[in-house]
């Protein structure tokens, strides 16, 4: 604690020293627009001396075209503004007057066709990789999910996204945190303007935010009713449906929006599990399991946004989610050996039904600017109830057969708020604020046969955070420095400081950033639960109430040059949370699958992406490596778990005549080590998509082939002190998918709510 206080005090002093300089500087601000008065974002702003045209300072316009640049002293200067696709403009500053700079299109006429220069697809902005989607081939890809799959450094597996070398990101759409990844599926790719990947989030984000993805949509204008209808049918070994209706009404300053979605999914999974237990008796289990699942999900959303004036807006969003009856069935056959000799043979069948009662969530926000002071306030509330009943019938060849029944009741309540202030100080911007989250979780598990213990978990957790960060341009570099303090109060209390610092610069067309941050990974609530789940009479699953949070120190170098992007990262994880197997205390022949903290794991990761454009062909090649250093005690030996994982992705997009687009994606992942798991299966996948648009882009059809090679198969070997477990999974991942979408007068919501508790909601 003393070290944390010293560290925090040092950073606060540094913040004070930085903000206390150059108080006599001149703030020059304004907007950049085109000839139709539409804002131009990401234009290069250069401040030049009026005396000799020497370089003084540089900046970039924001998405809304606004910019602010700091001059060392009050004087007359020249502003040079350039953006690819527009003619470069020079303009003298008008003292304290707000500048309005208009750029003309940089185009030429060839045989009656106007050809306009295309903006680059990739750019480093404030040290973050920004990918522009609007009017690019990616805008034809389908949904927000399809877009993210093609962003450098982002990986997708079974509908979930990770940032390479970082982990699961927080995702924003127009500044609002999303809690349900199906929102990405509901978002059309044509509505996305850009995607920004933040690999080292600053102090304004919670300490467990290891990466952030910010999606900004295309600015829409005009009043009236907008309609967006989509229908998707998928066929693997089962059928899948996704039906969606979006409505939007906009009039003057009022914006009302609503969404309804129905999803029907069926899945098949075959799993082979082999367990070796090294105790006084060498126990071995060989299991073959076949699982089928059925889900029907209903999602509704209603919200409004009201623009009070040019500087203030307020809004509220209500979301409802229900899944009346999720069903999972499986049948398993298990052979048990003791010291290599036959011991027993088990046949098991399971029927599990989960009822997710309507989960309700409310988000409200207020956003305002008073002079140079910016205020953002967000509040969240969530209520959910889940009821699960499970019945397992187990037949033993040598012992008495069993019927195991269990019920699990989970109630969640969450209340959260976040307040953020920003104000320009000493050639930069100083931001500070606070965050509060209160969570109440009730988790009751019961087994009438008393084979498993009845547990009654009540978790009340209060999370309080305070943060401050400062960013500014220093000569040719962009500096961001911040400090966050968090206090967690529950059965175990934790107080921590989390510093971060980054420095970004540009040399010609080469842009780069070096950053350091400290993050934390808190256990999910089901990992902390003391509930036990029955698999068979030799295998249980359980949580671990004694799990501690995992601390991560991260040093990252990233950069971009023309159509090349790269990232190199080193991480040290303390108290890493590992998925382990161990012996049940009451009977060492029984395996318990749970989680434990591990002392330390060091990780190195790097990737390189090349995204050239060759005529109508737009390839994107990404190669990466991820290597760890970890030692695991196993059966009296020390295993060095340091085999690297290699990744390779090749995305190909081709623009065809008559509004046809073809894309193919090839993904490869090699064998290698992750934590205490050896992944012994190479994974090779191929996807293809054919898209056609009609009626001036109002109607579109998409034909997709998912995992055409049926290569999404995984094999994992888990090592522990007295046990190892092999798990091999094969699912019905090969799928043919057809989507038809119609949009009329669509306009994205102006909703600016950012959410106040996304990571806490994920833990629930």
Model-derived regions: residue spans:
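Face-selective signature of the C-terminal outer-membrane beta-barrel domain
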Residues: 297-324, 349-494, 499, 506, ...
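Short acidic/polar hinge/loop motifs at secondary-structure boundaries
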Residues: 150, 176-202
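Short, acidic, small-residue-rich periplasmic hinge/interaction motif at the N-terminus
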Residues: 46-48, 82-86, 98-137, 157-158, ...
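Surface-exposed extracellular loop regions of Gram-negative outer-membrane beta-barrel proteins
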Residues: 216-231, 270, 274, 286, ...
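N-terminal periplasmic accessory domains that precede
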Residues: 96-102, 112, 144-147, 181-182, ...
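Outer-membrane beta-barrel signature, preferentially recognizing the C-terminal barrel domain
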Residues: 459-461, 520-574, 592-604, 731-734
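Short, acidic Ser/Thr/Gly-rich low-complexity loop/linker segments typical of extracellular
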Residues: 51-66
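A short, solvent-exposed loop/turn motif at the edges and junctions
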Residues: 48-54, 76-91
